[in-house]
Amino acid sequence: MIIIKNGYVIDPLTKREGKFDILIDGENVVRISQDIGIDDDIEVIDAEDCIVSPGFIDIHSHFRDPGFTEKEDIITGARAAARGGYTTVICMANTNPVVDNVETLRYIVDKAKTAKIEVLQVGTITKGMQGVELVDMEALKEAGAVGFSDDGKPIMDSRLVLEAMQKARELDVPLSFHEEDPKLVYESGINGGKVAEKLNMMGALEEAETVLTARDAALAVSSGAKTNIQHISSKISLGIIKLAKEMGANIIAEATPQHFSITEEEILNCGTNAKVNPPLRREDDRKAIVAALKDDTIQVIATDHAPHTKDEKAREFKEAPSGMIGLETALSLAVTNLVKTGDLTYRDMISKLTINPARFYNLDRGYIKEGHRADIVIFDPDEKYTVKEEEFQSKASNSPFIGKELFGKVKTTIYNGKIVYEDK
């Protein structure tokens, strides 16, 4: 048995907030009360000065397994997630082979059983991620796919997107879309703006995101499908999402910590480690993302954890792959750049990391209740620390936040009643 003592519990679903002790027996929380007695055989976790939250849920990660395990694999990705306070992670399908078939999905599902946390998987929307023919969504759902996404590539065929949405609504599964029209991306990973001009590039225009966001928002309105616009980066895209919500669309937008924390200027400091798709944009876009998190236009914080090797990121900017790791810094960036700034409360932040992503993916997770699974993170919101490359649990270290001082440190992560990470 484990008892968490003296912590400040915040659970957005039950609206419990205050000092409570939590008793865990086996896989489940068995008691939540003020001042539970301690027996000799109970392991005690002292959570003084810490917030006790439901374990975080990431709906957008890349564990690169199968096919690219020199970058990351399911085991190391799960280890990184546990260090970041995540107890459930949903992985994207752009592996090798892509997850458009039951055989590849079963490999991932079986390997995930040995991971430190819960690792779930989406299937692709189209076969081979080619944007031409839909996968057998029903068969993939039956085999364990929790949703569908061609993340990493846009789907340019509007009729195919509508058919996918209609099928997804029938099956009650969510779809997630990467919105970048390649005709408006001259060089990927850098905003079409002043920084690109300094580097003699044209970059990825904001319109690359907004035109596809507008199309898919309109299709979400007409189809009723559960739709996620991934890693939103543009102020204009946010206005489109807001309008679609007002028109009754079952649509959400996710924001990544990088898009609400830094701007295109970071490329001048960090080079390829700040290269992401869609790119970091202007300060007014960053502020708009923060405002949208505040007014709930954006309901989910997702990491888009995208590990790459040092050799890959050492290439010239145009040749280097896009993406940065994010699971181990997401909480700290949210605390530092959303809560400490006064834009979000801790409850608001935790909602976007727990119950909101759980609801979107139809998961019975994201809360702390007696008689239910003990997925819990304990973090010190006021502990300040420096991000160090050598402390990453991921195989990769492609992060622009190395060397930055951040608030909010995970102290303990508990998954399924077991301690899977402790800050030593």
UniProtKB/Swiss-Prot annotation:
Zn(2+) 2 binds at residues 151, 178, 231. Binds 2 Zn(2+) ions per subunit. InterPro entries: Amidohydro-rel (IPR006680), DHOase (IPR004722), DHOase/Allantoinase_Hydrolase (IPR050138), Dihydroorotase_CS (IPR002195), Metal-dep_hydrolase_composite (IPR011059), Metal_Hydrolase (IPR032466). Zn(2+) 1 binds at residues 60, 62, 151, 304. Keywords: Hydrolase, Metal-binding, Pyrimidine biosynthesis, Zinc. One of its GO terms (biological process) is purine nucleobase catabolic process. The active site is at 304. Substrate binds at residues 62-64, 94, 277, 308. Catalyzes the reversible cyclization of carbamoyl aspartate to dihydroorotate. This is Dihydroorotase. It comes from Clostridium acetobutylicum (strain ATCC 824 / DSM 792 / JCM 1419 / IAM 19013 / LMG 5710 / NBRC 13948 / NRRL B-527 / VKM B-1787 / 2291 / W).
